[in-house]
């Protein structure tokens, strides 16, 4: 039986840390679905639309065997169940991530006990990278090429130059 995993996230934007986890998970799972959240949590203000995040993820991950990129707009466990997955993959950058991730894993186990959450840590050179930090550096004109794949760096440069420097695409500067 094939082992199917789901790696959920906002991926706004997809970073080298995300790509590293996906690449390494290809050795662990027969199929990995990178599940891009259609509706990020209310505390997040995405720089990229869902379609942009999907396109960037698909471009970056296109050569990785067994990897698919899909949007989801439901409860994660419902998406996982519908895809026949038995694993939820989560990344842990630091000890500070653990408490929140542990809570999510515990809740998911209550909702769908036949699915396990597997945590992977990024390679050391990616441990400090987060999408929010990358967005902040890019918005302030910094060089993000060490933190994201080239296609993402170009998209960030376009997003944070000109009239939409605030990144939300409305041109209102805030």
Curated annotation (Swiss-Prot):
Keyword Magnesium: yes
SUPFAM superfamilies, sorted: Nucleotidylyl transferase
Record keywords, A-Z: ATP-binding, Coenzyme A biosynthesis, Cytoplasm, Magnesium, Nucleotide-binding, Nucleotidyltransferase, Transferase
GO biological process: coenzyme A biosynthetic process
Cofactor(s), by name: Mg(2+)
UniProt: ATP binding residues: 10-11, 18, 91-93, 101, 126-132
InterPro entries: Cyt_trans-like, PPAT, Rossmann-like_a/b/a_fold
Identification of the protein by name: Phosphopantetheine adenylyltransferase
